[in-house]
Amino acid sequence: MSFEELRVIIVVYSSALIPLIYLLYSYKKLPPWVPLIYITAFIACALGWEVWFTYGLVDGDAVDLRRSAVLSSWIPLHLNWFLNSLADAGTVTLGGFWLMWRMCSKDNQIFSSWSWKAFGVFYIWCICQNIFVELFLYHDQLADGKLLSWAPLAPLGSYLNPELFSFNGGSVMLQTQIPWIILPAVIYAAVIKYSNSQLIKST
């Protein structure tokens, strides 16, 4: 096992499990929308692209064909989409909302009415983390020439997938960025809707 493979394994498992453990431990202290949004984001990411990319369901290669045997043994095929979706829901989504809250002076009002500043923070976080993942974590299995499946939240598939830019030998492709271009606004709107529905119930 190389150091890079070890790094990928540690990051994948920690980004998937640490937020889940924290959520299970602290859910009574958190706003009621947090667990619901976590589950909603998990389902959206799993069905939106993670399952499709993992198994190569439509004109794509399964993840085992796009990475080393070591990674496939430590992150099995049938666990890959699950771990990635946990990380999407926890580290990316809930982590992004925590960062958004901190950057907006801990103003809880951003979760009950739309704030462009708050959304901007959340959107930039989602895009930047995805670029980081593509360049430094999954750069080998997402590299140019590795075919990813069409997916509902990556509707252009590999059919229209230009390279957006490259850095340090890694490439950022359009197909892998589209899900996090689409999803942040939907998730933020869902938080506001659910938060307001809870306020109505409590009055």
Predicted regions and their residues:
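Aromatic-rich, lipid-facing transmembrane alpha helices and their immediate juxtamembrane interface loops
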Residues: 1-203
